Amino acid sequence: MAKKSMIERDKKRENLMNKYLVKRQQLKTRLNETDSVEEKLLLNQELQKLPRNSAPSRVRIRCWLTGRPRGNYRDFGVSRHVLREMAHQGLLPGVTKSSW
């Protein structure tokens, strides 16, 4: 189980990301469309003024059950440990133990 403070920090980052998502996308599209160097510098400065934690790369994907930050399966949203236990219990439809 992950520390509660780390889980809450990630929730805060996700809220910030959602808050500034539209503004960040608008700035990035304008940055890619312009040709002048001066305007690119101004747009880049505006982009840097946004909060650091509002960047999507700062949000960590965590297991929704345990909060584990590593070894997550995106399709299920759980870590490898939880995935294994849920598969053994038959809680994941369509997942079977492989044998050959």
Curated annotation (Swiss-Prot):
GO cellular component: cyanelle; small ribosomal subunit
Superkingdom field: Eukaryota
One Gene Ontology term from the biological process aspect of the record: translation
Chief place of localization: plastid
Keywords: Cyanelle, Plastid, Ribonucleoprotein, Ribosomal protein, RNA-binding, rRNA-binding
InterPro entries: Ribosomal_uS14 (IPR001209), Ribosomal_uS14_bac/plastid (IPR023036), Ribosomal_uS14_CS (IPR018271)
Signal peptide location: none
Cell compartments where the protein resides: Plastid, Cyanelle
Annotated GO MF terms: rRNA binding; structural constituent of ribosome
Similarity annotation: Belongs to the universal ribosomal protein uS14 family.
Functional description taken from the UniProt entry: Binds 16S rRNA, required for the assembly of 30S particles.
Complex formation: Part of the 30S ribosomal subunit.
Protein name per the record: Small ribosomal subunit protein uS14c
Species, as recorded: Cyanophora paradoxa
